């Protein structure tokens, strides 16, 4: 069973210009993400998929393996599906390029279900939200998820789910961490599907899988780290690195 981490990286970003090349203690953000991916125990290979020559040149100077892709990908999963056509693997991990503090243990948590007798179509990670995290529940940039009793996703939304008619501390709420692992056949099938109605409504690519009958296994984790979507996120990551450098 060969597992490959694919990191989609594009230069254009609507909320933070050229964020993939933003400086983090002397290294570009995308390089930090790549270095964390290399620490995975279960992955056999790490490749960055980009359509940008500048990103490719920067990464190659650090020794990273890079695959050039079309600029027409509609989402990160489509970009890695294109890259996967030329990269042999049984499982592909979609690790967002803007996750410079990603825990290697989280990557392995997402991969572990595939090394069982009944590997899922896809897996992803979820993090528990506590009652005091109500701001995240209301934040449209925080994606929430509800699951069935077997741990498979029922729905992902930017809205607070489940809706709590009566506030109860016994109601479990989870935030989605945007890291996915796919069986090879499922990844290639995803790329052949048109964007779905709910995917377009929520701007959440994983809903394309749910709407087409695929199941997403949600793995709970207690490890969390901020991604970088805004300038405020970037400053937070810089502060965290100053206080506790990632080894």
From Swiss-Prot:
Where in or outside the cell it occurs: the entry states: Cytoplasm
Identify the pathway: Nucleotide-sugar biosynthesis; CMP-3-deoxy-D-manno-octulosonate biosynthesis; CMP-3-deoxy-D-manno-octulosonate from 3-deoxy-D-manno-octulosonate and CTP: step 1/1; Bacterial outer membrane biogenesis; lipopolysaccharide biosynthesis
Q: Which GO terms describe its cellular component?
A: cytosol
| Family (UniProt) | Belongs to the KdsB family.
Question: What GO molecular function annotation could you give as one example from this UniProt entry?
Answer: 3-deoxy-manno-octulosonate cytidylyltransferase activity
Q: Which UniProt keywords apply?
A: Cytoplasm, Lipopolysaccharide biosynthesis, Nucleotidyltransferase, Transferase
For this entry, the protein name equals 3-deoxy-manno-octulosonate cytidylyltransferase
> Do you know which CDD domains this protein is assigned to?
CMP-KDO-Synthetase
Q: Describe the task this protein carries out.
A: Activates KDO (a required 8-carbon sugar) for incorporation into bacterial lipopolysaccharide in Gram-negative bacteria.
Q: Give the HAMAP family listed for this entry.
A: KdsB (MF_00057)
Keyword Nucleotidyltransferase present in the record's keywords: the answer is: yes
Q: What is its EC number?
A: 2.7.7.38
Question: Can you tell me where the transmembrane regions are?
Answer: none
InterPro entries this protein is in? Cytidylyl_trans, KdsB, Nucleotide-diphossugar_trans
Q: Which organism is it from?
A: Chlorobium phaeobacteroides (strain DSM 266 / SMG 266 / 2430)
């Amino acid at each position: 069973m060969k597992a490959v981490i694919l990191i989609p990286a594009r230069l254009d970003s609507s909320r933070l210009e050229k964020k993939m090349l933003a400086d983090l203690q002397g290294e570009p953000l995308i390089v930090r993400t790549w270095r964390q991916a290399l620490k995975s125990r279960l992955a056999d290979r790490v490749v960055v998929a980009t359509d940008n020559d500048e990103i490719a040149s920067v990464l190659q100077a650090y020794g990273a393996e890079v695959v050039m892709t079309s600029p027409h990908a509609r989402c990160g999963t489509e970009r890695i599906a294109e890259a996967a056509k030329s990269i042999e693997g049984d499982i592909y991990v979609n690790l967002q390029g803007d996750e410079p503090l990603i825990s290697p243990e989280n990557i392995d948590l997402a991969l572990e279900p595939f090394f069982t007798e009944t590997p899922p179509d896809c897996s992803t990670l979820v993090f528990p939200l506590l009652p005091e995290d109500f701001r995240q529940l209301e934040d449209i940039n925080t994606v929430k998820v509800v699951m069935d009793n077997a741990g498979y996703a029922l729905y992902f939304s930017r809205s607070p789910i489940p809706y709590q008619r009566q506030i109860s501390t016994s109601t479990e709420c989870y935030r989605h961490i945007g890291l996915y692992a796919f069986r090879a056949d499922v990844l290639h099938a995803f790329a052949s599907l048109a964007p779905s109605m709910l995917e377009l409504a929520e701007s959440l690519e994983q809903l394309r899988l749910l709407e087409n009958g695929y199941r997403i296994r949600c793995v709970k984790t207690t490890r969390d780290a901020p991604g970088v979507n805004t300038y405020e996120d970037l400053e937070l990551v810089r502060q965290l690195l100053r206080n506790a450098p990632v080894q």
